[in-house]
Amino acid sequence: MYRENTKEIAIGNVKIGGTHPVTIQSMTNTKTENVKETVDQILRLEAAGCEIIRCAVPTMEAAEALKEIKKQIHIPLVADIHFDYRLAIAAIENGADKIRINPGNIGSEEKVQAVVDKAKEYNVPIRVGVNSGSLEKHILEKYNGVTAEGIVESALDKVHMIEKMGYDNLVVSIKSSDVLMCVKAHELIAKACPYPLHVGITESVSYTHLT
């Protein structure tokens, strides 16, 4: 199988991209503020082979909980941020090994710049995440709806914004609940930028739910 030679990125003590093997990441479904429940779930995931863990950070209390969670686990911790740039900054300050943001819902470029500056200070990678359900109006109009090309254009716009801010410690995530569209989008973006890709399917459900 052909593989793009992407930029090497360090997430804590785990390296991705370049010639490194694909790593397995999962996400907790606990309230991150509940340190014990979150740690217990992460340790079970570690035992099952998880190599990187992501936690939702919807509140400042959750951001502050990352510091204690980090002390009790053995794999890199990623903070999943939506809407409030201050949570991204707090997550980095409390030990997140990587943050996931969608610059399109963080707010103004000044707010994105504040997050980038903090990531630079701590040398923390940023995962730029875009999904098919959050495409900008002008992209939807240009491509007459949701398309792989539109998803890629939206993601590249955000990547280029952060590059212009002087930061390239990046991972890119593009997601769609349409599997074939998702595959095509990944093929397109792999040729368009040098960063490693986080591969996942949005709106995923359990097997028991499907049956």
Q: PLM features: residue spans?
A:
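Short beta-strand/loop segments at the ligand-binding rim of alpha/beta enzyme cores
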Residues: 70-79, 193-201
